């Protein structure tokens, strides 16, 4: 089965730096609080220290983790653990990630440090032309071997997950702005195959740093930069007809959002909300946000409500954003002066900002983030030091909702039986595991 066939099956049912990329938005249901159940996951920091179990005599390399204590911080630092012959992704920025119930997928990225980028082994230096998978149940990184043409625009592209398919659009190669993309590439993660999505209509310009989301069966792309000109264009790709359309809102030019890149978007099915972003010399405020109304084909400006004690989140670009139902979470980013390490929540019904008590162990920008359907956010990579131009390969996770009893029991089971993934399906069924949980082990 080809990647394109896999896609069809799912279908039927001035420039700024590109060396970083906040992850795309995710959506998923999580259980709310219930008598305090599982609330300890939300207000304490836990260090993961279990080693993966291996049968036989294969050696395990275990990199010790720096112990971090942050008051009221529910962030978990995930250590590097991998088999001989397997390595975690090198430090990077400008990459993107998405998540499902089972894996975190990390694509692309940039690191100008020759040694950190893999040295002579990396033919695409300073970019990373690679797709990684982090398996939640075993805590193991794996670089995926794929067939087909993997795109070469590997910094500040857009990435979304649609069924079993990764959809990649735009991005830039090296030098930034000189080799941008405007194609949609599809990778079926089940069959590990890349394909170019054949589309009709006039495609968007070759850009990077844009934001992208799937809404009601269409792919929406907003903003970005050519490397010289910043954009406020809004395009729509109908995933059924595969036809591009540039939307022309019913607004005066003075009522349009400012041109920008490295912003994020959220949506409620009726409106697309633009969060932050900027240019190489500015970052836009979050006090007021622009929203595109899909029904009226017009931009609206919405005044958000500040935190009663702290006020509004700082203006930022190169941050990350994930979404759980009507709650949108932004973290990290850069405001033009300092790297940010805060996490904020915006409710799309009340437009009230709430600052989470958690603080990122490493303030970071040009990172990526994704949320699982259960409500756990994973944050990977990014730039952690402006003056030294230093990047990280750290991976963190934080529960944004109170975990369900199933998720709490699942994490306890994995911690108690680290060799669970080595058992056969028949053995796992005899142990009483459901098919859904068994799929998360494989």
Swiss-Prot record:
Q: Where in the cell is it found?
A: Nucleus; Cytoplasm
Modification sites for Omega-N-methylarginine? 13
**Family matches, as InterPro entries:** Kelch-typ_b-propeller (IPR015915), Kelch_1 (IPR006652), KLHDC10 (IPR052125)
Region feature Interaction with CUL2, mapped onto this chain: 401-442
Q: Which biological process, per GO, is one annotated for this protein?
A: rescue of stalled ribosome
Mind telling me which SUPFAM superfamilies this protein's record contains? Answer: Kelch motif (SSF117281), NHL repeat (SSF101898)
Q: Would you identify the family this protein belongs to, as annotated?
A: Belongs to the KLHDC10 family.
Q: Which PANTHER family match?
A: KELCH DOMAIN-CONTAINING PROTEIN 10
This protein is called: Kelch domain-containing protein 10
